[in-house]
Structure formats: structure tokens, C-alpha cells
Amino acid sequence: MPIINFNNKEILFNYPISIIEIIKKFDKNLSENCIAAKINGKLLDVSEIINYDGSLELVKPENKIGIRIIRCSCSHLLGYAIKQLWPTSKMATNNITENGFYYDIDLNHKLSKNDLKLIEKKMHQLLKINFKINKINVTWGKAYEMFKNLNEIYKIKILEDNISKNSSLYIYHQEQYVDLCTLPHVPNIKFCMFFKIQKISGAYWKGNKKNKMLQRIYVTSWDSNSKLKNFIKNIKELEHRDHRKIGKKLDLFHIYENSPGMVFWHHNGWIIFRILEKFIRKKLKKFYYQEVKTPCIIDHDLWRLSGHLDNYKNYMFHTNSENKQYCIKPMNCPAHVLIFKKKIRSYKELPFRISEFGSCHRNEPSGSLHGLMRIRNFTQDDAHIFCMHDQILSEVSSCIKMIYEVYSCFGFKKILVKLSTRPENRIGSDEIWDFAEKQLELSLKKNKILFKIDLNEGAFYGPKIEFTLLDSLNRKWQCGTIQLDLCLANKLQAYYINNKNEKTNPVIIHRAILGSMERFIGIITEEFSGKYPLWISPIQVGVINVSVDQIDYVKKITKFFLQKKIRIISDLRNEKISFKIREYTLRFIPYIIICGKKEMESNSISVRNKYGKQLKYSSLEKFYNVIYEEIKQKKT
């Protein structure tokens, strides 16, 4: 006879009862918009039978967990539609994403855009049936038999690889369609009305390129039509801002299809890259770093000693020469340790700060590669600080200050901060991890930084602080990291001589600001829609003439600004002035100088800024002073 508490009210039930019936007893109206519930904090389907006392908490569609449940249920609706259209298809794995979900399927037929429309149409047809979703609790053996009869080979592999044979599990039925899930599902398919199929891509089974390539269908899914429409509106804006399109339009870079994840920088893009590099170098000088350069290919043994081969092997590229094995470095830290230990160092030399724009390679799955945002070869603005235990707080604080200084120059004001704690797969004792996590927590509190704890998401060698930027569309970009490492120096036998003349392992602080230079360029390209601030823009000023009479004057202006180290181009073609202005405007050139007869005779200039506003300057020097200040102040 369960006693259930809800909203400070208790009801005694004389028999085991389903959650949905319990909700109806409290308030019938509430049951219409409830998709799941918690009893004593445990998340359950509303069909669950309760025979024990507990506190009831409702899960509604708009709740954070509610939208996940809707997306899980909608992913099964997608599976149902696909099986209706292509009965021999095999369903593999589905995952919830930030805006919806994806499902990997094995289908002999290569899906087209028209097929995606057909799937979406079928999903809406199934919605009209308004069917209930049923759950059954089965043994591992029963589930295995069920999926074997359905010839669902991937579900069988999931059972064999991920689920204990002694456990029971839940199977969800959407009419004839059967699937596995660990989350509760909505009680009725009507809660899954608001979705849109977005795209399709390739994905290897289990992310392993040795396995079969599957087709991954991405779907956005929401709890209301207004949220769906708003998301689609944002998607159109994102398409307009897509750094890959802008990169092509502004001639910034390209990625050769036969060399996936590797960037070919063009002149304009490389200008931006070098500007960022120069900008970070100034910060490094301000915060007393030494810049170094280490090789890309390093002996296999170093990575074995550092622990990377045990913990990071699948993401590393390997090669060999003259019967020796090498790794192409995925990160710079072991190489920086070699520089530190090249000579005997005293405690008086600490903190020892070294930085590198290191070319790193990571074997990312081909299906996850995306323009500059996810690549295999990237440049890390990486640094390592070798210090003593009593220097940790001041050094981490200095890193935090540096990171915030950099982000402010790009107009990023919303920064989310997380403290990621020890993962299951790690090196070092619990005592070491306790100390390291506490030091990072104290550093954040000392600097009055609001942060969240991200359990079990630290690096294998130490906890880390992650800095995530929120852009103008409220997208999240994880960029900066500060990682505290009390293990690597010991593993690689790096030490300094302390004030008692004893060998002591230094603490290593791993620090990156932009993270990947390439990725950060992708981020700011989308943030500014290609209309970069003047100080970053690959072309800062464009000069055009109205007629051939002003050619010499344009050349004079161009020479003047080149001598002032302003990035300027000119267009002397015998074209209409409106055509030239439009062409430069489409190239997002911040300032366009227009030279006509009046300007030439008065030795002045007319300027059109990126907002289309017309400006007049009586001399080149006056205009230069304006843009010099804009560049100096790094206005965004």
C-alpha cells in the first residue's frame, strides 16, 4: 500500500498503481502534459507500477530531461519510419545531440535528399495514428532472441558488448517497431510532433574505420512548434555564417578531399592566422613565456613512457623508419618535458614557462570532420609551466587573467567555466588527484570565477579548467584549457633541484588559450559573418577610381597606406564605380576609398565603411589616424 507525496499532499493507495494513475488522482489535468516522472529521485516511465512509498516529481516536455525523453522517443519513430520504407534496413545506434538526435543505419540503398523527405513524410503519417508507446522488461536472453528473430545484427552486438547477460533491460514498442533504450519514453507518440530531418552523413560502426560505413541521419526535435521554427530560423542564419562558405568566398582556405582534415591556407586566410599568432606572441611576452619549436615526429618510446600510448593510442598517427617506430605528435607536452630536462634546473629557475605554436595531428574519425572546426592537423597555442607546489595558485591565476584578456579582444563576454575532475581511465594516486582538483578549485574561487563541476571529464593525467565561449547565436565553443599535471614529470623523470639540494618533480600546468588556431579562426569567421574587425581583416582598405583620370591618385593613396603597413588593395579596372563598390562590399572590406575628380583636385578622400555610411576626410593622414586607433584598440 504505497503512500505517495506530491506538492505537500499525501495519498495512500490500497494497491500497486501506475504513475500515470497516481498523477490523475492528484490532478487529472496534470496527466495530460506529463511525459515521465521521478519517484524518490529515480526517473521512470509513467506506465511504471509503484508498490512502495515515495515522493513524486513530474517531468514535463519543456524540462531539460523532458526534451531528452522526447528526442529518444522520436529517434524510435525515425527507426519505425525507415523500417516501414525499407524493411531490410538494420538499425545500429542512436544518440541525443544538443538540438535533437542522430541514428546510424545500415541500408544497401544510399539515401538521397528526396529519401529524407520521404522518411519525414512517413514519420508524420505514423504520428496521425496517435499510438501509445509500450515498454516491456525482459531478460538479456529474451532480448537477444527477439533481435535475432528480427535480424537486427547491430542490436545483438550491443547486447553482447555492452550489457551483462545477467541483467534485465527495457524494450520499447512503437506498434510493430521494437528497440532498446535506457531512458524512459513518452507515453504517447503525440509528444514527438515537432521535428525536422536535417542531413545525412557517413559514420563507421563504433567510430572505427575498420568497420562498415553506416548512414547517419540527423534530426532536430523539440517540445513545441515555436522552438522548432526558431531553431530552423537560426539554422538558416548559421548557413549564412558557415565558415566553409565564407572561406571560399573570401579565398581563405580549402581542404583537399583526398587529404581530409588537413587545411590548405590561402594568402588571405594565412594573413588572419599570422595576425592571431602575432597577437598571442605579444601576450606571451607580457606574461614571460619562452617560445620553442618541437618536431612533429617523435620516437614511439617517449609516448609509451608518457602514458599516451595506453590512454590515447586510437587518436594517434603512427609511422616507422629503419625498423624504428614513431608517433606523429597529437600534443606538445612530452616534447616540452624533454626541453625542460635537457639540463639540470634549480628551484630558482621556476616557474619555467615555455610555449609553442605546435603542429599536432589527431586521428579523428572521418565522419566527425567539419571544416576548420574539427580537423586532423591543427596548430595548438600550447604552453607548459613547470613550477613548485606553492606556485600553482599564482600561475593558474596568471593563466586565467591571460585567457580573459585574449577573449575580450574578440568581443566574447559570455564565458562558461567548468572544472573537470578525475576520469575513470587515469594515472596517479587519489591523493595526487585530491590535491590537484583542490588547487584548481581554489584558483577559480580566488579569481571570483563562477564555475560548474564536470565530473569524470578530466584528462587522464590531471584535472582541468575548461573555458567555453558563447557566441552571438548562443552556441558553445570550448577553447581554453588549464590542466594541472602532477604525474607526467615523474613518468618522464623530469626534476629540478630544490632548496634542500634534492631532486624533485615539478608540477606541470598545461595551458591553451585559443586551443586550435584553425578552429578559433572558424569560430570568429562565423561570429563576425566574415566581416572581421579591422585589426583582423586580411584586407583592411580597398581603393577604387571613378575614371582613368584618377589612376595616379589611387596609386599614390595605395603607396601611402602600404608604407603605413595597412593591408590595402586597389581596383583600377575600367568598370562602373557601382560595380566596383559592390564587389568590394561582397568581399567584406571594412573601408572603401572612392577617388573621383573632386577628391583628386582637393587631395581628399571619400570613404564608405562596412555599414554603408559615407565619410569625408580632408587628408590621407586624418583617415589613417582614425583607422590606426581602431586597429590599436582592437575594436570589434
UniProtKB/Swiss-Prot annotation:
Enzyme Commission number: 6.1.1.3
GO molecular function: ATP binding; metal ion binding; threonine-tRNA ligase activity; tRNA binding
Enzyme type, top EC level: ligase
PROSITE patterns to which the protein is assigned, alphabetical: AA_TRNA_LIGASE_II, TGS
Subcellular location(s) of the protein: Cytoplasm
Cofactors demanded by this protein: Zn(2+)
One Pfam family in the UniProt entry: tRNA_SAD
Free-text comment on the cofactor: Binds 1 zinc ion per subunit.
UniProt keyword list: Aminoacyl-tRNA synthetase, ATP-binding, Cytoplasm, Ligase, Metal-binding, Nucleotide-binding, Protein biosynthesis, RNA-binding, tRNA-binding, Zinc
Domain TGS per the UniProt entry, residue ranges: 1-60
GO biological process, one term: threonyl-tRNA aminoacylation
Catalytic activity, as annotated: tRNA(Thr) + L-threonine + ATP = L-threonyl-tRNA(Thr) + AMP + diphosphate + H(+)
Binding, Zn(2+): C333, H384, H510
Entry GO terms, CC: cytosol
Region (Catalytic): 242-533
UniProt KW Acetylation keyword: no
Family per similarity comment: Belongs to the class-II aminoacyl-tRNA synthetase family.
Quaternary structure annotation from Swiss-Prot or TrEMBL: Homodimer.
General function of this protein: Catalyzes the attachment of threonine to tRNA(Thr) in a two-step reaction: L-threonine is first activated by ATP to form Thr-AMP and then transferred to the acceptor end of tRNA(Thr). Also edits incorrectly charged L-seryl-tRNA(Thr).
HAMAP family in the cross-refs: Thr_tRNA_synth
Protein name according to UniProt: Threonine--tRNA ligase
Name of the gene encoding the protein in the UniProt record: thrS
